[in-house]
A protein has these predicted regions:
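Covalent nucleotidyltransferase
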Residues: 1-227
């Protein structure tokens, strides 16, 4: 395997991952997680904290899922961008939780300029929910802060070749919204757009008003038989 197609797959603490300079590319779908998704994640973290206290489980680590990053490089081989291919929903949510636990915390995902109104609305609503959770769980906050450093980890896959990244795209986290096949095809084409990418992205999204089951039906009838 050459240097363009090889990839690295390693566990990484969530704290360290959130501090990386990550970019949300234009082809990514909006942030769709709801309060229920956030509540499930908070409960999972709480369970992980309890498990870590059990005798013999002090080295226990809870994996929040897999994150796929495409490392975009310049001609000299230096990384210029770390684009999130998979794991955006979890990373944004974990960043919101971390911010609520530590108001001084910020990262590239929190500073990102979200242009989609659904993303803005869901981020705002979920952060309000996390603050509400924080107000009634004040006795647990120190444990949750420690979990980010010592218990929570992700599997980080770093890919140099973008085609390889999209081949790995079907490695989905069970907590996330399942992707339809047209999401991948849309993403593959949108990543080639250089100018006016966001305007083109919105044009494609308007086409997505077609019900997903109809698109899946078209894929099964016409695309899959030739693959």
């Amino acid at each position: 395997m050459n240097n363009d197609t090889e990839y690295r797959k390693n566990p990484i603490s969530v704290n360290k991952l959130l501090n990386k300079e990550l970019k949300i590319p234009e082809y990514q779908r909006p942030y769709k997680w709801t309060r229920k998704n956030v509540a499930d994640l908070l409960n999972d973290i709480g369970t992980a904290i309890e498990d870590n206290r059990r005798p013999g489980y002090d080295e226990f680590r809870y994996r929040v899922g897999t994150v796929i990053i495409h490392n975009k490089k310049d001609d000299a081989g230096n990384i210029t961008e770390r684009n999130i291919v998979d794991g955006q929903q979890r990373l944004i949510t974990l960043s919101l939780i971390k911010r609520a636990l530590d108001p001084s915390f910020t990262n590239s995902l929190l500073e990102h300029e979200y242009k989609d109104k659904d993303s803005v609305g869901n981020i705002s609503d979920n952060y309000c929910f996390i603050l509400e959770w924080k107000s009634v769980n004040s006795g647990k906050l120190e444990d949750y802060r420690g979990a980010f450093e010592n218990i929570l980890e992700a599997i980080l896959i770093e890919v140099n070749d973008v085609s390889e990244a999209f081949q790995l795209f079907d490695s989905q986290n069970t907590r996330g919204r399942e992707l339809d096949p047209h999401d991948l095809l849309k993403a593959y084409h949108l990543r080639e757009m250089n100018e006016y990418a966001f305007e083109k992205f919105n044009l494609v999204r308007r086409r997505e008003e077609i019900r997903p089951y109809r698109i899946r039906e078209l894929f099964s009838l016409y695309l899959y038989p030739i693959l």
